[in-house]
């Protein structure tokens, strides 16, 4: 069975991962999960999650030439925590739509993991008035991560910290 997560479901999954592991640091999470990170020249690919059935070991391969390797590792962790029971290579007639949905979910997971709401709230005094690009640079994340996070914050009109939302507008 394929589980299609909502954005809210992904956020809750990330919060659970952070609580369980005591960190949002992708390297520490990989260490705790015994997931090895291998850096190689992957050509056009940014990264991939591999499972070795013989040893029941997971590996994350990342392209050594990438600027935002942390995001790619977080993306692959998204596949691990959201989709590890689903092997799209074995799903008969796996459509491009399904593949795109799974990739989108992994990217949302990565965005929530490397730029948490708590991080944004704590940095508010420093980043107030910053553009999305400046916020991305402040946290050293790709700009699409801040685009996603700020759109999510803006969508919660009944949020407790409503005064903080206006600062991200």
Curated annotation (Swiss-Prot):
Zn(2+) binds at residues 75, 79. It is an enzyme of class 3 (hydrolase). Pfam families: Peptidase_M78 (PF06114). Signal peptide: none annotated. InterPro entries: IrrE_HExxH. The keyword Nucleus does not apply. Gene3D superfamilies: 1.10.10.2910. The active site is at 76. One of its GO terms (biological process) is proteolysis. Its EC number is 3.4.-.-. One of its GO terms (molecular function) is metal ion binding. Keywords: Hydrolase, Metal-binding, Metalloprotease, Protease, Zinc. Involved in the regulation of horizontal gene transfer through the integrative and conjugative element ICEBs1. Required for degradation of the ICEBs1 repressor protein ImmR/YdcN. Interacts with ImmR. This is Metallopeptidase ImmA. The lineage of its organism: Bacteria, Bacillati, Bacillota, Bacilli, Bacillales.
């Amino acid at each position: 069975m394929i589980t299609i997560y909502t954005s809210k479901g992904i956020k809750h999954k990330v919060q659970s991962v952070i609580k369980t592991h005591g960190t949002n640091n992708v390297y520490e999470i990989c260490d705790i999960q015994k997931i090895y990170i291998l850096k190689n020249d992957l050509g056009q690919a940014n990264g991939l999650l591999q499972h070795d059935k013989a040893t029941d070991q997971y590996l994350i391969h990342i392209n050594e030439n990438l600027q935002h390797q942390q995001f790619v590792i977080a993306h692959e962790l998204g596949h691990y925590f959201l989709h590890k029971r689903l092997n799209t290579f074995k799903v008969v007639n796996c459509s491009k739509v399904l593949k795109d949905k799974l990739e989108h979910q992994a990217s949302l997971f990565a965005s929530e993991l490397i730029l948490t709401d708590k991080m944004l709230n704590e940095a508010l005094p420093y980043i107030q008035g910053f553009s999305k690009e400046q916020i991305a640079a402040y946290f050293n994340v790709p700009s699409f991560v801040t685009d996603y996070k700020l759109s999510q914050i803006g969508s919660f009109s009944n949020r407790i910290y409503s005064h903080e939302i206006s600062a991200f507008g």
